[in-house]
């Protein structure tokens, strides 16, 4: 077995090692992908529980907490064919009731602030008619 046969073996086994490396490292194994999906689902569930926990009173949150931990394993739910525990509802940051109570007159002030050419108007401060639309004092009338 000379040096020539060693190079022959090396050239034979190089593609095999590369192929084995691809199978082991590059291609995802189904068990790993399901565990990654489970980890993502668990993280999403924890974020949802933290959002719900912030909205619930503290004594009620203590009662609800253990029930969530009993059913925390998502794999058991999939085998038992449970649906989603908590429906995902998109809610605005400011509640509707508070939005009705707030006085947002930004649209009204913006309409008064600029003229048709985009120039800022300084007139009509406080409802006075002593200034014109460009902020110049009117002496007539």
UniProtKB/Swiss-Prot annotation:
Positions of post-translational Phenylalanine amide modification: 82, 122, 139
Tissues expressed in: Expressed in larval brain tissue localizing to cells in the anterior and medial protocerebrum. Expressed in cells in the brain lobe, optic lobe, subesophageal ganglion, thoracic ganglia and the eighth abdominal neuromere. Drosulfakinin-0 is expressed in the central nervous system including the subesophageal ganglion and an abdominal ganglion.
InterPro entries documented for this protein: Gastrin/cholecystokinin_CS, Sulfakinin
Keyword match rRNA processing: no
Gene Ontology cellular-component terms listed: extracellular space
Compartmental location: Secreted
Biological-process GO terms, alphabetical: adult feeding behavior; adult locomotory behavior; inter-male aggressive behavior; larval locomotory behavior; multicellular organismal response to stress; neuromuscular junction development; neuropeptide signaling pathway; positive regulation of cytosolic calcium ion concentration
Mutant lacking the gene: phenotype: In adults, RNAi-mediated knockdown in insulin-producing cells or all Dsk-expressing cells, increases total food intake and the number of feeding bouts over a 24 hour period. However, feeding them the CCK antagonist SR 27897 does not result in a further increase in total food intake and feeding bouts, as in wild-type adults.
Induction: Up-regulated 24 hours after starvation and then appears to return to normal expression levels 48 hours after nutritional starvation.
Positions where Sulfotyrosine occurs in the chain: 117, 134
Record carries keyword Ligase: no
Keywords carried by this UniProt record: Amidation, Cleavage on pair of basic residues, Hormone, Neuropeptide, Secreted, Signal, Sulfation
Domain of life of the source: Eukaryota
Molecular-function GO term, any one: neuropeptide hormone activity
Pfam families: Sulfakinin
Annotated signal peptide: 1-33
UniProt propeptide residues: 34-73, 86-111
Record-stated family: Belongs to the gastrin/cholecystokinin family.
Known role: Involved in diverse biological roles including regulating aspects of gut function, satiety and food ingestion, hyperactivity, and aggression. Regulates gut muscle contraction in adults but not in larvae. Functions downstream of TfAP-2 and twz in octopamine signaling pathways to modulate feeding and male aggression.
Name of the protein in its database record: Drosulfakinins
Species of the source: Drosophila melanogaster (Fruit fly)
Source lineage: Eukaryota, Metazoa, Ecdysozoa, Arthropoda, Hexapoda
Gene from which this protein is expressed: Dsk
